[in-house]
């Protein structure tokens, strides 16, 4: 908290996204494991539902996963999503933000994204981090924090 966020430029369905292009605005970066899975879909729909509220609070919302731009495009169209989804296929952005971690399922370990949200202030510094996010009510909590900045 209080540190400058790592800069990045990545592809997104509507074109590229550059972190530097968001300067002067608050930014919510939510890292999620995978498109079209129940928790990830709910989270994206919650942030989409509140998109206008975040905009009124001067805050841009972006989601980041390892999925391809093509996958993000299909995910957005299928669910009518209104948030920017950024592809991190090489996982280097996830690594720089410290959310690329060893996970386990059914006794097997693998590397993946820990569901995490980062709130960035207008100066590009980390204002708050939510690690190991539980989706229910999360977007509401993030909006309240963004409004309070």
How would you label these PLM feature ranges?
Residues 1-149:
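Chalcogenol-based redox active-site neighborhoods
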């Amino acid at each position: 908290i209080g540190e400058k966020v790592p800069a990045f430029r990545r592809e997104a369905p509507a074109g590229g996204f550059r972190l530097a292009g968001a300067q002067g605005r608050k930014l919510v970066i939510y890292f999620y494991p995978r498109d079209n899975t129940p928790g990830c879909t709910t989270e994206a729909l919650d942030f989409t539902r509140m998109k206008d509220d975040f905009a009124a609070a001067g805050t841009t919302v972006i989601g980041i996963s390892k999925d391809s731009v093509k996958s993000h495009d299909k995910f957005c169209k299928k669910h009518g999503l209104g948030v920017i989804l950024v592809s991190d296929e090489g996982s280097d952005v996830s690594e720089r933000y410290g959310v690329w971690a060893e996970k386990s399922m059914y006794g097997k370990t693998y590397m993946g994204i820990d569901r995490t949200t980062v709130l960035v202030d207008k100066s590009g510094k980390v204002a708050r981090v939510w690690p190991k996010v539980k989706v229910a009510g999360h977007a509401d909590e993030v909006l309240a924090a963004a409004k309070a900045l």
